[in-house]
């Protein structure tokens, strides 16, 4: 199992590198920002090829929506993600929270880590500007 896991990591890193190389040939300046898979950040060659990372549910919602995650899990993920901020690359964190006070606490905490927070609903069917949903422009198009 350990060998398979190591091989899966190596294959995924090689896959992301191949995508990045091909995309940047076709479109110089193409950005590669994977979602989750922060365990791969331990590999310096992987960090070198990506331009940032997106991370969902860092503080809340791993097991139960809008409930705090296990502190050990948070620390482990933050340590990995900080490898990327140490390389001066952004970490975008998406938390699925509704309560304004929880959003504000999470925002302050994520910014202290040097991460860029974003808050929305899990269905991803609306955008938020700050702590409020963005206006619905569908009515404008009628």
Question: Which residues fall in each region the model found?
Answer:
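Glycan-processing catalytic domains of CAZymes
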Residues: 1-142
């Amino acid at each position: 199992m350990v060998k398979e896991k190591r091989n899966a990591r190596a294959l995924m890193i090689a896959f992301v590198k191949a995508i990045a190389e091909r995309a940047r040939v076709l479109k110089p300046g193409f950005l590669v920002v994977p979602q989750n898979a922060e365990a791969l950040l331990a590999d310096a060659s992987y960090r070198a090829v990506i331009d940032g990372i997106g991370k969902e549910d860092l503080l809340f919602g791993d097991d139960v929506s809008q409930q705090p995650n296990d502190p050990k899990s948070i620390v482990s993920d933050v340590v990995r993600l900080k490898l990327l901020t140490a390389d001066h690359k952004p970490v975008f964190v998406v938390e699925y929270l509704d309560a304004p006070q929880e959003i504000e606490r999470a925002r302050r905490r994520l910014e202290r880590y040097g991460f860029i927070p974003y808050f929305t609903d899990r269905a991803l069917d609306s955008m938020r500007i700050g702590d409020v949903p963005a206006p619905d422009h569908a009515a404008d198009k009628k």
